[in-house]
């Protein structure tokens, strides 16, 4: 059985990156929650 986590910087950024978050309404909601919480890093 293979390991499920096969790291890829591009895939990571495209699915969880800042621009990916900004692209949808729910993604923007995620960012605003993280800002409200005071996260140092909003997105990958």
Curated annotation (Swiss-Prot):
Q: Which GO terms describe its cellular component?
A: ribonucleoprotein complex; ribosome
Give a yes or no for keyword NADP in this entry: no
Keywords from the UniProt entry? Ribonucleoprotein, Ribosomal protein
Q: Name one GO biological process term.
A: translation
PROSITE patterns to which the protein is assigned, alphabetical: RIBOSOMAL_L34
Recorded GO molecular functions are: structural constituent of ribosome
Superkingdom of the source? Bacteria
* Signal peptide boundaries: none
UniProt cross-references to InterPro entries, sorted A to Z: Ribosomal_bL34, Ribosomal_bL34_CS
**Which Pfam families does the UniProt entry name for this protein?**
Ribosomal_L34 (PF00468)
Regions annotated as coiled coil: none
Q: Which family does it belong to?
A: Belongs to the bacterial ribosomal protein bL34 family.
UniProt name for this protein: Large ribosomal subunit protein bL34
Taxonomic source organism = Pseudomonas syringae pv. tomato (strain ATCC BAA-871 / DC3000)
